[in-house]
Amino acid sequence: QTLVTGANGHLGYNLVVALRDAGHRVRAGVRSLGDPARTARLKALGGVELVEAELRRPDQLRAAMDGIDVAFHAAAVYDYVTPGRGQEILDASVRGAEAALRAAADARVRKVVLTSSVVTLPFTAPDDPPSDENDWTTDLRVPYVRAKTEGERVAWRVAGELGLNMVTVLPGAILGPGFARNTPSIDAIEAMSMGALRFGAPDMNFPLVDVRDVVAAHVLAAEQDCEGRFAAINDTQPTFRSMLETMHAIDPKIPLPMMQMPGFLARALPLFDRLNHAMLGTPQSLSSELAASLQGKIWNVSNRRAKERLGWRQSITMEQSLRDKLETIRANRNRHA
């Protein structure tokens, strides 16, 4: 029997569906059973047991872990741009991970697969070799980056203290279908589709991966006799311009950028982001801290370890992933309208 925390999120929901379809007994953990917005899709699946698993409630987590063989801890607060949420994001990642692991150990769960992030790995200079699972970022000025990094480090410490069998999966920015509410990754794509970069694309890249490939990495990490960290990210990390060219080919109404934005304007990207939000209604997706962290750096992450140790492969192209994401964004927008 399996447990998925954060089961109403983009990754969590797709993981629940995949496990159920593979014939596993699935327990889906959510913050509150009394919130229809967070439970309706899970209830509609059928064959899935819903339980409350609030990260601040150790008693709920312990009850949710009872009888579980493999626990997938995917619950997190994912936010780059909302001011004043730093402590909430940090607590959910650090205290939440520790509480989940202690509950799993107490319930004698056989294995825990914890969802971390490629943001725990350092950005690199353009000519440097890619970062991998042996590396840890030291630039913690972005609250979400700090939360995921400190959360995973605490998880490894606690797992060691408790003798708990744990592996971590480090996804990139998750694309693809199967979401009801936007994440920052989805906000970025929606903003681009609405013309947020029509006047210029920054000379930056994006660490993409499809949700179906992230699910596959989690399942393989659970099934294989393995240990350590595994980066689940596409083979290449595309530039914003190449992403927009692909999106324009999917939907010609999505505008291409008029130019490559000069490097000296990169620091002003958060200002442009706020202006686009005010004038075009695009979602905000970039903070000043993240823009500063990326100055002169790129996302360059190796997925070699996941390929060699797990037998994982990128199976969904960027084009298919963007197509499915754009279709889901439009469907959600129409439903809410």
Where are these predicted regions, by residue range?
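N-terminal Rossmann NAD(P)H-binding glycine-rich loop of SDR-like oxidoreductase domains
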Residues: 2-24
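NAD(P)H-binding glycine-rich loop region in Rossmannoid oxidoreductase-like domains
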Residues: 33-95, 103
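Conserved Rossmann-fold NAD(P)-dependent oxidoreductase catalytic core, especially the SDR/UDP-sugar
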Residues: 73, 77, 83-144
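Short-chain dehydrogenase/reductase
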Residues: 90-94, 129-130, 134, 140-153, ...
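Conserved beta-loop-beta element that borders a ligand/cofactor-binding pocket
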Residues: 116, 151-177
